[in-house]
């Protein structure tokens, strides 16, 4: 009952906010960045100005990953998906250009970030620079699964292998971590994932709405100590 009351209260606050935005008239564009939380058990990195930690002489670069339905650019700095094209969906009607779901440009940011945080997580205070054995990974015609491993070794010799898992005909992307700890220390860390998007949309993504707050709203989610994370649609609210 308390959970239901809390959900109704959150919905009421959101509706009141939209009414106030419409009444205000003058909209203010902001060049800030918002994040959509996927899962979190510790404080997530909050700034792109964090230091970059990498393997010796390793430079961040973009890795190309292709399946029959996805064309990705994965940044070895943190293992962030910088770009994602949906090959089966055109950007416009009768266009041969695929729809770009995720993109990273100086003017606009929409990324899928993930990492390990916590006291011993490599993403806690910096974005590690991983190394990859290939510049390009392509799912073969006779393959059902494509695995893209990237490796990072910290100053203590702990080895982190972050592997992206893609399957034929599917759009979901799995992430697997393997941690090899040669030290006597017990390591504590948690996985986090987030979608990071600029508030101000470029023209090709602008839906025409005059309310900037609507651009980044994706629906509501609620959880408590008694109930698991659950997503609610507009109809449920």
UniProtKB/Swiss-Prot annotation:
InterPro entries: Membr_insert_YidC_N, YidC/ALB3/OXA1/COX18, YidC_periplasmic_sf. The keyword Cell membrane applies. Interacts with the Sec translocase complex via SecD. Specifically interacts with transmembrane segments of nascent integral membrane proteins during membrane integration. This is Membrane protein insertase YidC. Residues 34-53 are annotated as: Disordered. Pfam families: YidC_periplas (PF14849). Belongs to the OXA1/ALB3/YidC family. Type 1 subfamily. The keyword Transmembrane helix applies. Coiled coil: none annotated. Keywords: Cell membrane, Chaperone, Membrane, Protein transport, Transmembrane, Transmembrane helix, Transport. The chain crosses the membrane at residues 7-23. Required for the insertion and/or proper folding and/or complex formation of integral membrane proteins into the membrane. Involved in integration of membrane proteins that insert both dependently and independently of the Sec translocase complex, as well as at least some lipoproteins. Aids folding of multispanning membrane proteins. Its main location: membrane. It is a multi-pass membrane protein. One of its GO terms (cellular component) is plasma membrane. The gene is yidC. GO terms for molecular function: membrane insertase activity. Residues 42-53 have a biased composition (Polar residues).
């Amino acid at each position: 009952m308390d959970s239901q009351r809390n959900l109704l209260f959150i919905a009421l606050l959101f509706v009141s906010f939209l009414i106030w935005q419409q009444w205000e008239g003058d909209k203010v564009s902001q060049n800030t960045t918002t994040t959509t939380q996927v899962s979190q058990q510790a404080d997530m990195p909050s700034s792109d100005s964090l230091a970059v930690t990498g393997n010796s002489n390793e430079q961040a670069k973009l890795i190309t990953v292709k399946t029959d339905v996805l064309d990705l650019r994965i940044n070895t700095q943190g293992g962030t998906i910088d770009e994602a094209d949906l090959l089966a969906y055109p950007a416009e009607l009768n266009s041969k250009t695929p729809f770009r779901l995720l993109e990273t440009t100086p003017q606009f940011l929409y990324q899928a970030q993930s990492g390990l945080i916590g006291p011993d997580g490599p993403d806690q205070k910096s974005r590690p620079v991983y190394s990859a054995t290939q510049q390009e990974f392509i799912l073969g015609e006779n393959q059902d699964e494509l695995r893209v491993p990237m490796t990072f070794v910290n100053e203590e010799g702990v080895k982190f292998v972050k592997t992206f898992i893609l399957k034929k005909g599917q759009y979901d992307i799995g992430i697997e971590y393997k941690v090899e700890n040669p030290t006597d220390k017990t390591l504590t860390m948690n996985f986090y994932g987030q979608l990071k998007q600029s508030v101000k949309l470029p023209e090709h993504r602008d839906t025409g709405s005059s309310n900037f707050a609507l651009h980044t709203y994706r629906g509501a989610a609620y959880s408590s100590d008694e109930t698991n994370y659950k997503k609610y649609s507009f109809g449920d609210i």
